[in-house]
């Protein structure tokens, strides 16, 4: 096992070197700390928002019994932001959504012309859409000078992406952070997200798609089925740090997706040392 681990580490190091040629290694400590904070919130969603920063007020819960979609609308008065977070896969019901790869018209949001999204996640989003829009509006009306943030891990990452897209039709001040996000839609959807969230470069992006090592979930659903990633990828390589975070723009297969990870693996469940729902950070 140690020999295998050593070989894998060498292979990953070599792959990181190749990615460096096409990407930028290292981000600012401020941005790194921000990504860690959002990862903390996303991982805490698996365990009823445990151990989140003390500045955050936990508000109303988002929930639908038929789809088992869970989330919360939070508020951080220290940063003046309203945060919507979605839990990742936590049940067999969620797994049924995960494996429904049929591309489906994004019919709840007509502004996204030609957009098709993951069929299972669209079912999930449709089941909580009214709740989310209502709860966010309630907070935004009460705190009009606050910005909006949407985040989530795994299934929750794709839910966050669909939510951010829909919210973008009403609000301009949205930032999206996803962790271990599956491919959420087709090329038209990715293009819409990149345009709306200025994700054509790391200097302007408001769509931070964070990946880790050889996380296998960002490789799903297969690109061959018409799926395309959006956002600017921030690829975290162990040992995790600001310096070991790569900024990957352009071809999505040059960083995490090039590592050959398959499905749910250790790299998927743990981001920046925090394991989904463990609450040990």
UniProtKB/Swiss-Prot annotation:
Its EC number is 3.1.1.73. CDD domains: Lipase_3 (cd00519). The keyword Hydrolase applies. Transmembrane segments: none annotated. The active site is at residues 154, 215, 268. Glycans are attached at residues 100, 173. It catalyses: feruloyl-polysaccharide + H2O = ferulate + polysaccharide. GO terms for biological process: lipid metabolic process; xylan catabolic process. Keywords: Carbohydrate metabolism, Disulfide bond, Glycoprotein, Hydrolase, Polysaccharide degradation, Secreted, Serine esterase, Signal, Xylan degradation. Disulfide bonds join 50-279, 112-115, 248-255. Pfam families: Lipase_3. It is found in: Secreted. Residues 1-21 form the signal peptide. GO terms for molecular function: feruloyl esterase activity. Its main location: secreted. InterPro entries: AB_hydrolase_fold, AB_hydrolase_lip/est, Fungal_lipase-type. One of its GO terms (cellular component) is extracellular region. Involved in degradation of plant cell walls. Hydrolyzes the feruloyl-arabinose ester bond in arabinoxylans, and the feruloyl-galactose ester bond in pectin. Belongs to the AB hydrolase superfamily. FaeA family. This is Probable feruloyl esterase A.
